[in-house]
Regions:
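Loop/turn residues immediately N-terminal
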Residues: 59-61, 104-107, 143-147, 183-187, ...
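Residue-level detector of Asp-centered blade-edge/turn motifs that repeat once per structural unit
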Residues: 47-50, 92-95, 132-135, 172-175, ...
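Trp- and S/T/G-rich repeat-edge/linker motifs of beta-rich repeat architectures
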Residues: 26-33, 68-74, 114-122, 154-162, ...
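Bacterial Sec-dependent N-terminal signal peptides
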Residues: 1-27, 45, 52, 179, ...
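Coil residues (strongly favoring Ser/Thr
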Residues: 129, 154, 195, 225, ...
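Residue-level "micro-hotspots" composed of small/polar
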Residues: 19-53, 74-87, 123-125, 163-164, ...
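Conserved beta-propeller blade signature
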Residues: 52-54, 97-99, 137-139, 177-179, ...
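Short loop/turn segments that connect beta-strands within beta-propeller blades
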Residues: 65-68, 110-114, 150-154, 191-195, ...
Length: 686
């Protein structure tokens, strides 16, 4: 029996999230031919009624479902196919159905058959622009003429310009008014009934000898403004109510010549301008203009300077098409401050984050597995990197396994290299400590975690058990009160008990009574091969454990345990760290996203790249909560920090589409399924 693989493509299912985070940190996700895009020259982009993102290129039409690209190209052996692979423009009618402009005419997409119907009168014509009005009439700019096409009866009407002129652009406003731009610098209001025009000179009070060809009109979706780009020059804002205009002088402000290719009004006070020299963000109220540019050293910067088009999706995400560098996505959900390595002078070094802590000065210390320690300086907001230094005063090794700050001291744990102690003021390592179980041991225990307790005691979890700092003799001593097993975490509960996470079990020690007790796998109702990675206590005194078999809640009163796994909402069974907030919610890092779990209701919300994460893959022992309530989580590509109160998720109904059928890992041919493999189901994001 053949193995059938059904791929459920979840179309841009994002939790709606309100955020108050700083919006100045622009991060972009990149899609290029390596990710499945047919060609890196992306010309246009649109989202259809089902949520698919369609991208036009010079080598076919791409449909993106959030995971994979499906490419539609010209097929000479098929009658209902695109006539040209060069896509010039895309749009949807009032029903949300897709229409495609190409160098060989206009096509209507049939999503059931996944075929394209050619509009006959556009044969062999390049389609410059098209747009639907509120009556679902299609307006097309073709050969310098404006054409109105009735999609119901296929009748069309041509609106031709006066002699020696040509229409260069047009737009339809939210009031359903048709405005046309021409090569002589006029913007004209068309009355379709009697074909009359009201024309206005948008150069009446501008500098003389300015090129007058209007290249683009973009109607504001929120106000009565029309944004105007004119050839090889600048931007104007036209007010249809007053029939007057304003010059923005973008080029003068930035002292460079730009080619304007696209507009997008992010909100009523912010205009995005796509040019051949990067992204310009213009604040309507203040006139402030910010330029966002490509940085080849930054993996999350713009892919290129040359922007060709914008598209806003239904979640207010912004897709950016580039002339030669594919597609970028900008997420509107910005609850997380993101830090990642790149080659800048004051950037973070190393990708794999192993531990995080803050000091009394507000600096953030980040230990990596591949580049020593980074300090995010509070005063300058820049990173300083610390690695081994020949001759002393440096780290023992670049592979950091534990960090903890205590006053002016920073405790640094290594793999088989013991503990370094750094003076935070001087930034020098002032002493090194060995971790030896007894006088016969010659090899240091490998550090897994470091914990400074409420009373200031320093505990170190290692592969061989627990070590405790001896203040009197300035050394670390092996603590026989704890089992001699590898310790993944150390946690102090409200009663002062010290919890450790181990293989197959958790153990807690009571320093007051000098007694301890195991909480083995059978009491936790879990598998024998489980690992406890972290532990924490909720307000009711229940213990929560992050394990490789999910998250476990243990009730001391009843002795019962409750499991959270992929079967009941977790994105992964591998949970690394748990941080509780002030609202009875646990924040959990996993191998497949960041989770918030409401302890009262059990509701799980997962955060991924769609919410601004740089990766879903978090890391062991890499989380911290500072005194101001800021949470830090480390991943294999950097770290994030945020305040839970600024992340407010809301449930959203979402569609799931069966987008393709695979047989033995290969897509099904048309002879297997005669119509599109799409089917729909409604889910509640809870």
């Amino acid at each position: 029996m053949k193995h059938l693989k059904l791929i459920l493509s979840i179309l841009f299912i994002f939790c709606l999230t309100r955020t108050y985070a700083d919006d100045s940190n622009y991060l972009f996700r990149h899609y290029q031919v390596e990710n499945g895009l047919s060609d890196n020259m992306a010309t246009c982009c649109v989202q259809d009624r089902k949520g698919y993102i369609w991208i036009g290129t010079r080598d076919g039409l791409n449909r993106f479902d959030g995971y994979t690209f499906k490419v539609f190209r010209n097929d000479p052996d098929e009658t209902e196919t695109l006539g040209s692979n060069w896509i010039t423009c895309l749009g949807c009618d009032m029903n949300g159905d897709l229409w495609v402009g190409t160098l060989s005419g206009l096509y209507q997409y049939d999503d059931e058959k996944e075929s394209f119907r050619h509009i006959p009168f556009t044969a062999d014509k390049g389609i410059d622009i098209f747009q639907f009005d509120k009556d679902n009439k299609l307006w097309i700019l073709m050969d310098g003429n404006l054409i109105r096409f009735n999609t119901e009866d296929s009748q069309f009407r041509i609106f031709a310009p006066e002699d020696n002129q040509s229409y260069t652009t047009f737009c339809i406003t939210r009031e359903n008014s048709i405005w046309i731009g021409s090569s002589d610098g006029l913007i004209s209001l068309l009355n379709p009934e009697d074909e009359t025009m009201e024309s206005y000179n948008v150069f009446a009070h501008s500098s003389p000898n300015t090129p007058r060809k209007l290249s683009m009109l973009y109607p504001s979706p929120t106000t009565d403004r029309i944004y105007i780009a004119f050839e090889h020059d600048d931007v104007k804002i036209f007010d249809p109510a007053t029939r007057d205009y304003q010059d923005l002088n973008i080029q003068k402000i930035n002292q460079l010549t730009i080619l304007i290719n696209s507009f997008l009004e992010k909100d009523k006070d912010e205009l995005w301008i796509g040019t051949d020299s990067g992204l310009f963000i213009y604040k309507i109220n203040t006139g402030e203009c910010t330029r966002i540019r490509q940085d080849p050293l930054d993996p999350y910067a713009l892919s290129s300077h040359f922007i060709s088009a914008f598209c806003r999706d239904r979640e207010n995400g912004i897709w950016i098409c580039f002339h030669q560098n594919g597609l970028n996505y900008y997420s509107p959900f910005r609850p997380f401050h993101v830090h990642y390595p790149w080659d800048g002078q004051y950037s973070m070094k190393g990708e794999v984050i192993r531990d995080i802590c803050t000091d009394i000065y507000g600096n953030i210390w980040v230990g990596t597995e591949d580049a020593g320690i980074n300090c995010l300086e509070k005063k300058t907001e820049t990173f300083t990197n610390y690695q081994p230094v020949p001759g002393g005063n440096g780290l023992s090794h670049t592979n950091i396994r534990g960090l903890a700050a205590s006053g002016d001291r920073l405790w640094i744990g290594h793999v088989i290299h013991g503990i370094d102690l750094m003076d935070i003021k001087t930034r020098k390592v002032i002493k090194h400590y060995n971790l030896l179980k007894d006088s016969l041991t010659v090899k240091n225990s490998t550090v897994r975690c470091i914990k400074v307790l409420q009373e200031g005691q320093v505990y170190v979890g290692t592969d061989d058990g627990i070590y405790k700092y001896d203040f009197l003799n300035d050394r670390f001593l092996y603590a026989p009160q704890f089992p001699p097993f590898a310790v993944n975490c150390i946690y102090e509960d409200r009663l002062g008990r010290i919890w450790t996470g181990m293989f197959n079990r958790s153990f807690y020690y009571n320093p007051i009574s000098n007694t301890g007790m195991y909480l083995p796998y059978d009491k936790l109702n879990t598998q024998r091969h489980n690992f406890v990675n972290d532990a924490c206590e909720d307000k009711d005194g229940n213990m929560w454990f992050a394990t490789v078999e999910g998250v476990i809640k243990y009730d001391f009163q009843t002795g019962e345990s409750l499991h959270y796994t992929v079967k009941n909402g977790m994105p992964s069974n591998v949970a690394f760290r748990i941080l509780p907030d002030e609202n009875e919610t646990l924040w959990i890092s996993t191998a497949n996203g960041l989770v918030s779990l409401e302890t009262g209701t059990g509701k799980i919300t997962t955060y991924t790249e769609s919410h601004g994460l740089i990766t879903r893959q978090f890391n062991d022992n890499s989380a911290f909560k500072d005194n101001e309530g800021t949470f830090y989580f480390g991943s294999v590509k950097g770290f994030i920090h945020f305040k839970p109160s600024e992340v407010i998720p809301a449930a959203e109904k979402m569609n799931v589409h069966l987008g393709s059928l695979e047989i033995q890992n290969e897509a099904g041919e048309k002879r297997i399924i005669n119509s599109s493999a799409e089917s729909e189901a409604n889910l509640n994001n809870s």
